[in-house]
């Protein structure tokens, strides 16, 4: 059996899809389905079982027997960078992750988890997987950073793979449930469908992000499992591109429209990453040779999926 937490979420459901594609359907999905609309992310995929996230961690703590587990992909978390309830974040993103990590270590189960480029904060260079380059700007980023630090403490003694991925700006299919946290491509497409022009913040021509297609993210996770990879790695394309490039790809797909600029919101000032670019040196050194879709390639594929 394979366990995927956050399996109804964007990255989790794409990992389920990637597992199905290699013939694995013996998957236990763990999630919080309070937002029932997320069910659509797995409706075309095959899993063996579902468990509520709180029931699951209670079973872990109680020492219940789950049978033979080949891997745990821990994608479940509060992913809202605008969330400032620190107690909630630390419970969901830190304490929960620690319990699951120790369960995997105790049973020698390969453990793969979602970290985030938010751990780097507002820096404009050196996105390298080392403590000296990490200074998160928000509570979400801090919760992810703290778990990375915890993993660094236990890694030297681990007898089974423990692997974290600092996801950069992930976009693509199965994110419609995320609301304001969905990718800019998703929101721009919705604006176009309403007959509006795609809207970007003023100054966005200078905002560069490492936009990585979600199917590429899932591929790296599967590769890490199949190759027993341990460590903490950046997961982006290694090339920053502009929000303008995303908007242009959406316009090109629809064959109409032009970019409109809107004021930059006050609540994001000083808490906004204006540049991100994954340094892939460590991932490549670990042996990953796969390519990553460009914004033009990934957005075109995503638009076709959204507007199918």
UniProtKB/Swiss-Prot annotation:
The entry's substrate-binding residues are: 169, 180, 187, 201-204, 209, 272
Q: Which Enzyme Commission number(s) are on file for it? A: 5.1.3.20
Query: What's in the keyword line of the UniProt record?
Result: Carbohydrate metabolism, Isomerase, NADP
Signal peptide (UniProt feature, chain positions): none
Q: Indicate the residues that form the catalytic site.
A: 140, 178
- A Pfam family matched in the record: Epimerase
- Residues binding NADP(+), per UniProt: 10-11, 31-32, 38, 53, 75-79, 92, 144, 170, 178
Reactions mediated catalytically: ADP-D-glycero-beta-D-manno-heptose = ADP-L-glycero-beta-D-manno-heptose
Per its Swiss-Prot or TrEMBL entry, what cofactor is needed? NADP(+)
The UniProt entry's GO biological process terms, in alphabetical order, are: ADP-L-glycero-beta-D-manno-heptose biosynthetic process; carbohydrate metabolic process
* Pathway(s) where this gene product acts: Nucleotide-sugar biosynthesis; ADP-L-glycero-beta-D-manno-heptose biosynthesis; ADP-L-glycero-beta-D-manno-heptose from D-glycero-beta-D-manno-heptose 7-phosphate: step 4/4
Cofactor binding description: Binds 1 NADP(+) per subunit.
- Family matches, as SUPFAM superfamilies: NAD(P)-binding Rossmann-fold domains
Q: Which GO terms describe its molecular function?
A: ADP-glyceromanno-heptose 6-epimerase activity; NADP binding
Which family does this protein fall into? Belongs to the NAD(P)-dependent epimerase/dehydratase family. HldD subfamily.
- How is this protein organized at the quaternary level? Homopentamer.
- NCBIfam families, A to Z: heptose_epim (TIGR02197), PRK11150.1 (NF008360)
Write out the function statement from the record: Catalyzes the interconversion between ADP-D-glycero-beta-D-manno-heptose and ADP-L-glycero-beta-D-manno-heptose via an epimerization at carbon 6 of the heptose.
Task: Present the record's domain note.
Answer: Contains a large N-terminal NADP-binding domain, and a smaller C-terminal substrate-binding domain.
Question: Can you name this protein?
Answer: ADP-L-glycero-D-manno-heptose-6-epimerase
Native source organism of the sequence: Actinobacillus pleuropneumoniae serotype 7 (strain AP76)
């Amino acid at each position: 059996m394979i366990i995927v937490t956050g399996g109804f979420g964007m990255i989790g459901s794409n990992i389920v899809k990637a597992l199905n594609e290699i013939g694995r359907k013996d998957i236990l999905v763990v999630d919080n389905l309070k937002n029932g609309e997320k069910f659509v992310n797995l409706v075309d995929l095959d899993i063996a079982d579902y468990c509520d996230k709180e029931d699951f961690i209670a079973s872990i703590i109680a020492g219940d027997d789950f049978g033979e587990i080949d891997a745990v992909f821990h994608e479940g978390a509060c992913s809202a960078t605008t969330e400032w309830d620190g107690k909630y974040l630390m419970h969901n993103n830190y304490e929960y992750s620690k319990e699951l990590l120790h369960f995997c270590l105790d049973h020698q189960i390969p453990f793969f988890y979602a970290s985030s480029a938010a751990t780097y904060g507002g820096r404009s260079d050196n996105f390298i997987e080392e403590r000296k380059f990490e200074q998160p700007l928000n509570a979400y980023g801090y919760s992810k950073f703290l778990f990375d630090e915890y993993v660094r403490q236990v890694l030297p003694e681990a007898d089974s793979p423990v692997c974290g991925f600092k996801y950069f700006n992930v976009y693509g299919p199965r994110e419609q449930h995320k609301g304001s946290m969905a990718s800019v491509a998703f929101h721009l497409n919705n604006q176009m469908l309403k007959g509006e022009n795609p809207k970007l913040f003023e100054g966005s021509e200078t905002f560069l992000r490492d936009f990585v297609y979600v199917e590429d993210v899932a591929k790296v996770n599967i590769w890490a499992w199949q190759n027993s990879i341990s460590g903490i790695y950046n997961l982006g394309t290694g090339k920053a591109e502009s929000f303008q490039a995303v908007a242009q790809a959406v316009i090109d797909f629809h064959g109409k429209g032009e970019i409109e600029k809107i004021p930059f919101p006050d609540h994001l000032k000083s808490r906004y990453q204006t540049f991100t670019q994954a340094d892939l040196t460590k991932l490549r050194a670990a042996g990953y040779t796969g390519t990553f879709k460009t914004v033009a390639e990934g957005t075109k594929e995503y638009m076709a999926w959204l507007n199918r």
